């Protein structure tokens, strides 16, 4: 049988871009704890010994931004100067402005041309789900996330004390060309920062035996599966000392690993009035419920918005030939069962809560945590009944 390959990557919480994402979302959560209607667009830059906080924030909350940044860095594991970046010693610069009043009047209810709560910007967002894994996520990104989660677990509990916070993973999966389903794992790449006193051979054996094999399904590993562990041979310098990190630079890691398109808007540091974030979460919720309902084995939804306008400017669905009913019918069901106006999304998914720091590493989707309301399949039964299936 013919097959094709598809690859997705993930990065650990200690990757510099993810450090920035987590600081941005920790600041968002600290603000939402005091002021759930705050407007937040918190951007972060991290580099050797330096954190820069900038963006637009309008709130009555009183937050010690420097303390939040340091505590986030400490939790991730950068707590010694040996790593070139540590929570106590780094400089933190703060430069937040307020949200533009021109934008605010389009988002605030009762202001602007559309008196409903309008979208915070124009843009397009995608949601996706498929039946490749129990959480209805694509196989490669799901397991790429699990690998770096396992790396962090073994680092933090001391079982592999030579591990350091920065790490990356990559899964190449072979798919059956006829069924479109995962067939075998072709290649596993895992690069992890480490202390200088561990040999490459010892590191490779420990990573394969203690990180890779406990995570990946044994039946998907074959004699031909390639394991590429720290393929440069050395990864001592890492984190913000090795690379500058920025909020919003891992948007494919955050979503579907390239298995679905991305509208381009990042998530972290943005309050839910920003449809870049909230509508992408709603898109995942819609797509996952469509697949869970058996309306399709694979579903991609696109929604788009105009700044200041509540109703989406478009809703479209693609099921890649796996649909049980016509796509046009699915779009009708989406409009009946899901309120995709910004305020409707916020209420539907209960988004005015300090839940976002947890989303900022290991993927925003495919994690069935209690806070991740967009992962629920509570609409599936109603969709299936309304579809007549």
Curated annotation (Swiss-Prot):
Signal peptide span: none
Instruction: Name the chemical reaction catalysed here.
Output: L-methionine + ATP + H2O = S-adenosyl-L-methionine + phosphate + diphosphate
Write down how the cofactor binds this protein. Answer: Binds 2 divalent ions per subunit.
- Annotated ATP binding lies at 15, 166-168, 234-235, 243, 249-250, 266, 270
Q: What is its main location?
A: cytoplasm
Where does the source fall among the domains of life?
Bacteria
Gene Ontology biological-process entries = one-carbon metabolic process; S-adenosylmethionine biosynthetic process
Assigned keywords, A-Z: ATP-binding, Cytoplasm, Magnesium, Metal-binding, Nucleotide-binding, One-carbon metabolism, Potassium, Transferase
Q: One GO MF term, please?
A: magnesium ion binding
Q: Where is this region: Flexible loop?
A: 99-109
Cellular localisation: Cytoplasm
Which cysteine pairs are covalently linked by disulfides here? Answer: none
Subunit annotation: Homotetramer; dimer of dimers.
Explain the purpose of this protein. Catalyzes the formation of S-adenosylmethionine (AdoMet) from methionine and ATP. The overall synthetic reaction is composed of two sequential steps, AdoMet formation and the subsequent tripolyphosphate hydrolysis which occurs prior to release of AdoMet from the enzyme.
What is the protein name stated in its UniProt record? S-adenosylmethionine synthase
Record organism: Laribacter hongkongensis (strain HLHK9)
């Amino acid at each position: 049988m013919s097959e094709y390959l598809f690859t997705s990557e993930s990065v650990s919480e200690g990757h510099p871009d993810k450090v920035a994402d987590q600081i941005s979302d920790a600041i968002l959560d600290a603000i939402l704890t005091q002021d759930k209607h705050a407007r937040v667009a918190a951007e972060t830059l991290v580099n050797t010994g330096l954190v820069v906080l900038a963006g637009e924030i309008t709130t009555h909350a009183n937050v010690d931004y420097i303390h939040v940044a340091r505590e986030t860095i400490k939790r991730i594991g950068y707590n010694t100067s040996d790593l070139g970046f540590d929570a106590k010693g780094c400089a933190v610069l703060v430069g937040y402005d307020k949200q533009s009043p021109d934008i605010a009047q389009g988002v605030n209810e009762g202001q602007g041309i559309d008196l409903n709560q309008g979208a915070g910007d124009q843009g397009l967002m995608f949601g996706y789900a498929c039946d490749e894994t129990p959480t209805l996520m694509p196989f490669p990104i799901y397991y790429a996330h699990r690998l770096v989660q396992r790396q962090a677990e073994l680092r933090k509990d001391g079982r592999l004390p030579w591990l350091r916070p920065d790490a990356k993973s990559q899964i190449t999966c072979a798919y059956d060309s006829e069924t479109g389903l995962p067939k075998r794992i072709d290649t596993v790449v895992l690069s992890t920062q480490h202390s200088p006193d561990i040999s490459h051979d010892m590191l490779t054996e420990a990573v394969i035996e203690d990180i890779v094999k406990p995570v990946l399904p044994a039946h998907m590993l074959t004699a031909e599966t390639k394991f590429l562990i720290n393929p440069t041979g050395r990864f001592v310098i890492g984190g913000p000392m090795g690379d500058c990190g920025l909020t919003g630079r891992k948007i494919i890691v955050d979503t579907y690993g390239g298995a679905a398109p991305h509208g381009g808007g990042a998530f972290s540091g943005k309050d839910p009035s920003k449809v870049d974030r909230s509508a992408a979460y709603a898109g995942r919720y819609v797509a996952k419920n469509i697949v869970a309902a058996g309306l399709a084995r694979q579903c991609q939804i696109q929604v788009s918005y105009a700044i200041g306008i509540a109703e989406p400017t478009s809703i479209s669905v693609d099921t890649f030939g796996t649909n049980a009913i016509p796509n046009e019918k699915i779009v009708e069901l989406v409009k009946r069962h899901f309120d995709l106006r910004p305020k409707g999304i916020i209420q539907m998914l209960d988004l005015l809560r300090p839940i976002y720091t947890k989303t900022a590493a290991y993927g925003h989707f495919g994690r069935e945590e209690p806070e991740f309301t967009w992962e629920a399949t509570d609409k599936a039964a109603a969709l299936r009944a309304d579809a007549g299936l």
